[in-house]
Amino acid sequence: LHGSVWKTIDDATNQPRALVRFSQDKNGVLSANIEKILVPSEANKCTMCEGTYKNKSLIGLTIVKNLKNVGQNKYDKGSILDPQSDKTYRFSVTVSPDGEKLTARGYIGISAIGRNQTWYRVK
């Protein structure tokens, strides 16, 4: 995942939300930052956000932290920030065999109780 850029899709509206870029530290731990907002009305400031991020730019914001490779195309043990709700969730990722899609899963407690989003690789 290191260096790759992904288009996030809102699971409620099925519309593109942002581009995020993954990076990896020297220990192999991944994080991801928002590189671009794809919703024109939210490009400069997040008017839909609550709390900390209301009316602030989200460009450069680290939304994924501490994601670790746990097997072929599988990453887990991370966290993801939802700036709109100002909440942080546990986070895991499974990359498709062709490397073009990933299933992002955010959850509280156990993974069985959570939500999936499909993100698409940007070349």
Kindly label every feature range from the protein language model.
Residues 99-101, 107-123:
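Edge beta-strand at a domain terminus
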Residues 33, 104-105:
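Hydrophobic core segments of beta-strands in well-ordered, beta-rich domains
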Residues 3, 8-91:
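Central antiparallel beta-sheet cores of small beta-barrel/beta-sandwich binding domains
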